[in-house]
């Protein structure tokens, strides 16, 4: 099923709007930045394909939360937080040490309310320049 260019442009405009988080709904203890037992955010680059241009090799980016005490020798569950149309790896705000997602993860793990796990926010665009001005948004679908 095809999508009109107008529908796609409208979806992108809506997606690019500012996301408002009602921080009052998040208990204060989960919003605190941990000085001890804090995980880290790593920004990575990885090889992928441009699925609109016959599989051309491209490089994509992702942000990865690694819990405090992370070890390559241990197995972890992984949560992939995907963005919507027009978004990218930064859409969830998990871009630095002050990220609300990071602070919540650190505290949920610290208070032993969840087991440590990895969070990945990848760039799920199907093309190299999917959300850049002048690109073919139909290739997103």
What are the functions of these language-model segments?
Residues 1-141:
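Non-catalytic cap/lid and distal C-terminal segments of serine-dependent acyl enzymes
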């Amino acid at each position: 099923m095809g999508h009109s260019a107008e529908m796609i442009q409208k979806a992108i405009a809506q997606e690019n709007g500012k996301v408002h988080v009602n921080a009052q709904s998040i208990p204060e203890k989960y919003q605190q930045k941990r000085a001890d037992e804090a995980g880290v955010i790593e920004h990575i680059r990885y090889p992928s394909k441009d699925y609109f241009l016959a599989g051309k090799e491209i490089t994509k980016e992702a942000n990865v939360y690694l819990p405090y005490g992370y070890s390559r020798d241990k197995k972890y569950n992984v949560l992939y937080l995907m963005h919507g149309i027009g978004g990218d790896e930064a859409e969830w705000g998990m871009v630095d040490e002050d990220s609300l997602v990071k602070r919540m993860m650190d505290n949920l793990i610290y208070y032993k309310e969840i087991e440590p796990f990895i969070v990945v926010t990848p760039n799920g665009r199907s093309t190299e320049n999917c959300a850049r001005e002048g690109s073919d948004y139909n290739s997103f679908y």
